[in-house]
């Protein structure tokens, strides 16, 4: 169950980062303020909830194992950037993502 909490904390953290990115997207001048307040408010909510879940994780998992698992954020953000904003990702970047996933699998299997 704690591993599910860790993944959910990671996803919420990423959601907060993505909301911040969305807040910077161009909108019409008459809608800009509402747009920014909405997305930054969602970002704060996601990041705040992620922090609360992270505290639960730290109570149950050694920090030397838990913290590297947050590198999952790089994987989630890359996938979201490609899907949501059609951002280009180089083969070198994908290689790095693969190494991160490999590292997470190795660390996770030691517990």
Swiss-Prot record:
Enumerate the spans annotated as EamA domain: 40-109
Q: Name one GO cellular component term.
A: plasma membrane
Instruction: List, alphabetically, the Pfam families matched.
Output: EamA
Q: Where in the cell is it found?
A: Cell inner membrane
User: Oligomeric state and partners?
Assistant: Heterodimer of ArnE and ArnF.
Name under which the protein is recorded: Probable 4-amino-4-deoxy-L-arabinose-phosphoundecaprenol flippase subunit ArnE
Q: How does it sit in the membrane?
A: Multi-pass membrane protein
The metabolic or biological pathway listed in the UniProt record of this protein is: Bacterial outer membrane biogenesis; lipopolysaccharide biosynthesis
**Naturally occurring in which organism (per UniProt):** Shigella flexneri serotype 5b (strain 8401)
Is NAD found in the keyword set? no
Instruction: Please give the family membership noted in the entry.
Output: Belongs to the ArnE family.
Q: Where are the transmembrane segments?
A: 36-56, 61-81, 88-108
The protein's predominant localisation is membrane
**GO MF annotations for this entry?**
carbohydrate derivative transmembrane transporter activity
Arranged from A to Z, the UniProt key words for this protein are:
Cell inner membrane, Cell membrane, Lipid A biosynthesis, Lipid biosynthesis, Lipid metabolism, Lipopolysaccharide biosynthesis, Membrane, Transmembrane, Transmembrane helix, Transport
Q: Which GO terms describe its biological process?
A: lipid A biosynthetic process; lipopolysaccharide biosynthetic process
Report the function annotation for this chain.
Translocates 4-amino-4-deoxy-L-arabinose-phosphoundecaprenol (alpha-L-Ara4N-phosphoundecaprenol) from the cytoplasmic to the periplasmic side of the inner membrane.
């Amino acid at each position: 169950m704690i591993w599910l909490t860790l993944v959910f904390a990671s996803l919420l953290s990423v959601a907060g980062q993505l909301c911040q990115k969305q807040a910077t997207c161009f909108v019409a001048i008459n809608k800009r303020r509402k747009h920014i307040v909405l997305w930054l408010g969602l970002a704060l909510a996601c990041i705040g909830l992620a922090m609360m879940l992270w505290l639960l994780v730290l109570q149950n998992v050694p920090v030397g194992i838990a913290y590297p698992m947050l590198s999952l954020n790089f994987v989630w953000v890359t996938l979201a950037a490609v899907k949501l904003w059609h951002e280009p990702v180089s083969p070198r970047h994908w290689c790095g993502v693969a190494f991160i996933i490999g590292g997470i699998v190795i660390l996770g299997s030691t517990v």
